[in-house]
Design a protein with these regions (language model features):
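Bacterial N-terminal signal peptides that target proteins for export
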Residues: 2-15
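Zinc-dependent metalloendopeptidases
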Residues: 28-289, 309
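N-terminal extracellular ligand-recognition/capping segment immediately after the signal peptide
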Residues: 321-356
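Short strand-loop junctions, especially beta-strand C-caps/beta-turns
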Residues: 93-97, 295-297, 330
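Hydrophobic beta-strand residues in large extracellular and virion-surface proteins
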Residues: 121, 136-138, 157, 292, ...
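Right-handed parallel beta-helix/beta-solenoid
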Residues: 91, 286-314, 318, 343-355
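Bacterial N-terminal signal peptides
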Residues: 14-24
Length: 356
């Protein structure tokens, strides 16, 4: 995705809407608006369990998260990057149970993400991916679900609500590496989980599998109530059928002050928020984008979003002519003559300055 080039043009764009959890896992999103069905063997691979309502991850990892323990061996940041799709290319195939109309619906959903990020969905020749390739197998199901990130070899993406485009987009975002917004470690600052209205309360299996925050989560940006990846206010309410969402009276999720105007808006499945778009574009950026964060450890900086440059001069010099340098924190550039023809943009709430 290319931008018009301006020399040191500053603008505020939405940074990140979503809590990103770089764990090899699977997510399955709420069926929308119908009730959630039980997990089927063909939808969830052996050795995987459901967590976060629509997240299916290796059972051993689920046990580690729910017990408050890290998995061994310890996972470091370098491994997290490997969960992104190489060069933004996502190979896929359709199961024979997916109709032509539903295939078209999925391809249209893919186009939504291709329009905002440097990602490309490529259907395998003859709709059959090599057995040793990394690819997404898209199938008709009684649930909406998707493995999270590029987990290696075949991974399933299940769709029940083909008629709702942004339910499919939601699942594709899981496949690109995203978890849910309300799984952020800072979520209790913004929303309250009403245990009395939740199926089984806050000590039950529903809470543990759907609302408990993993220790290994990584947050970027501010809390986005408008995110496509947020639960709705009635998720798993006692008013609803088991494992489902409905027009409940006793809300499970209450938005805290001063953001109560978002109460009925959370959980939308109609669009990508501005921050959703920014998030996916940063993780799958244009080839000429670089990132700068003066608070990041310099020795680790490579110019990517996850590992930005810490030195402003290094960042500017490394940005290709005509490219874009994103400033991720309140940072400054030293006073000097600059001849790099690049566009400099800032994340939301971030101020980039020249001089002290």
């Amino acid at each position: 995705m290319k931008n018009n080039t301006k020399s040191f043009t500053f603008s505020n764009l939405g940074l990140l809407a979503i809590a990103l959890f770089w764990l090899a896992a699977t997510a399955h999103a709420q069926i929308f608006p119908t009730a959630r069905a039980k997990t089927r063997a063909e939808s969830v691979p052996d050795g995987y369990s459901v967590i976060d309502g629509d997240i299916i991850m290796p059972t051993a990892k689920v046990k580690a998260i729910l017990s408050g323990q890290k998995e061994l061996p310890d996972v470091n940041d370098a491994v997290y990057i490997d969960l992104l799709w190489t060069n933004g290319i996502v190979l896929f195939e359709f199961d024979i149970n997916v109709s032509a109309a539903n295939q078209s619906a999925a391809i249209s959903a893919m186009a939504v993400l291709e329009s905002v990020a440097n990602v490309q969905f490529e259907q395998c020749p003859f709709n059959s991916c090599p057995i040793l390739a990394n690819f997404v197998h898209i199938q008709n199901s009684t649930m909406n679900s998707s493995q999270v990130g590029m987990v290696g070899l075949r991974q399933n993406l299940n769709v029940a609500n083909w008629e709702t485009q942004y339910v499919i987009v939601h699942e594709l975002l899981h496949a690109l590496g995203f978890y849910h917004e309300q799984m952020r470690s800072d979520r209790d600052t913004y929303i309250q989980i009403n245990c009395g209205n939740l199926q089984g309360g806050c000590n039950g299996d529903v809470y543990n599998a759907n609302f408990k925050v993993p220790l290994l989560s990584v947050n970027y940006g501010y809390y986005d109530f408008d995110s496509l990846m947020h639960y709705d206010e009635c998720a798993f309410s006692n008013d609803c059928a088991a494992g489902s969402t409905c027009a409940c009276t006793n809300k499970v999720i209450t938005v805290r002050p001063p953001n109560q105007n978002q109460q009925t808006l959370i959980g939308q499945r109609t669009h990508l928020s501005a921050l959703d778009r920014a998030t996916v574009s940063f993780l799958y950026p244009a080839d000429d984008w670089r990132f700068y964060d003066c608070t990041y450890p310099a020795i680790l900086g490579t110019g990517t979003f996850l590992h930005p440059y810490a030195d402003p001069i290094t960042a500017l010099v490394a940005t290709p002519p005509g490219g874009t340098l994103w400033v991720l924190k309140n940072c400054s550039f030293p006073v000097r003559v600059y001849n790099q023809q690049v566009t400099v943009k800032t994340a939301p709430g971030v101020t980039a300055r020249f001089g002290n």
